[in-house]
Amino acid sequence: RDLRMSRGLGDVYKRQNYDFSTLFENVVWGNTQMFFPISLVMIGSWLIDRESTHDTLKNIMTIPVSMPKMLGAKLFWVGIFAVLLGIYSVGVTLITGLTVGLSGLTVEVFFHGGTQIVLAALTTYLVCMPLILIFGQIRGAYLGGSILAFFLGYSMLFFKGGILASIYPFSAALILVGFDMSGYAGTTTAPNPLLAVIGVGIMVLWAVLLLLMSSNKKEIKSRKQANSKGKGKRAVRRKGR
């Protein structure tokens, strides 16, 4: 039965002139629009949120690890995860296409489509870094961050032309990997790679600023902790007198 269903699905794809090239394009579009933003923001924010949930954030105050370094390390591993997720997506796409019997699989198609998927995972990660840092530092907000990432990714459909079609961060993530959005988002103007670089660059710069601001946050917490200890010692001395 499963074999017949697989063949039937393959026949449907063939009737719609579906081939491996089209399949790879659909995966790149779907990943950047929904799957990667939701997954990366949810998992990245969750990793940072563990420090607050497990009450281990206070340990940073006593060991020589700054808040920016801690957050930067977690962002780095989320980036590694994004690349691995892209490679995994390439494998699943290949297996799916072979299972349903799609045509058009060549070395060139596989290399081009697979490279676009992995690079799109990386550029989408760069765009999502500020969201990961913001919602990761708000206790229990990682689910809300993933929902916002979904809406931001889906909003690509509303920018059909002009500057916003190229500078909008999630659209820019696709433009930088050479993806043609005209057949998916209905864009009416040619993409501008320079604006795309600016769009992604703004998000990276925002993430850097958030990392720098996190050091001030740690200093404020340290001062509050020192002040509370000082007040406690003074109270003990008064009682002793």
Report the location of each language-model feature:
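Helix-loop-helix units of permease transmembrane domains in multi-pass membrane transporters
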Residues: L47-G79
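Structural signal for membrane-spanning alpha-helices in multi-pass inner-membrane proteins
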Residues: G44, L85, S89, T93, ...
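Hydrophobic alpha-helical membrane-insertion segments
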Residues: R1, M70, F76-S89, G145-G161
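Terminal transmembrane helical anchor/hairpin motif
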Residues: D11-F24, S146-K231
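Long, highly hydrophobic alpha-helical transmembrane signal-anchor segments
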Residues: D11-D19, S45, S52, N59
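Intrinsically disordered, Lys/Arg-rich low-complexity segments
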Residues: S228-R241
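Transmembrane alpha-helical segments in integral membrane proteins
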Residues: P37-S52, L57, C128-L143, I202-K218
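Secretory targeting signals
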Residues: R7, D11-F35, S39, G72-Q137, ...
